[in-house]
């Protein structure tokens, strides 16, 4: 079940913090060995309404997760981040541009409207996509070849 993200919920708790001090900005994205494979976790969570910071972090990490040696399985963790049209466009560009073929892409924490927009943009580009409420089910789906 997807619930529309309440913008006030994500702005009230971080109003007193400088954007560079947010946990989501400091959190590193990484490769996780799991069930005999590897998954790239792109952590864009906890950045709240600071879309430009989310995009900057995504652009820095794109150079890493698009390397030929990087995993073809990727999870975008978007909890506690306002998902804007601009962020959706940046995610799509990172996944679609030539040079790296992804096998499966999971999204964790996306609201219903963002899910629809991402599906519309990413459908038919040669990789499976699915949306989850938590990281554990996303990990299981990414590396379970029977669930395509």
Predicted feature locations:
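Amphipathic, Lys/Arg-enriched alpha-helical "gate/interface" segment within cytosolic domains
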Residues: 2-148
């Amino acid at each position: 079940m997807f619930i529309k993200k309440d913008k006030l919920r994500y702005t009230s708790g971080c109003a007193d913090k400088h954007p560079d001090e947010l946990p989501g900005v400091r959190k590193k994205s990484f490769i996780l060995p799991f069930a005999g494979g590897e998954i790239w976790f792109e952590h864009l969570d906890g950045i709240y309404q600071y879309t430009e910071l989310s995009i900057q972090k995504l652009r820095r990490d794109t150079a890493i997760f698009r390397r030929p040696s990087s995993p073809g399985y990727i999870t975008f963790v978007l909890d506690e981040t306002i998902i804007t049209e601009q962020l959706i466009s940046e995610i799509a560009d990172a996944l679609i541009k030539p040079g790296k073929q992804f096998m499966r892409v999971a999204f964790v924490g996306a609201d219903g409207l963002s899910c629809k927009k991402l599906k519309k943009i990413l459908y038919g580009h040669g990789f499976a996509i699915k949306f989850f409420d938590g990281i554990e089910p996303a990990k299981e789906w990414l590396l379970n070849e029977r669930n395509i």
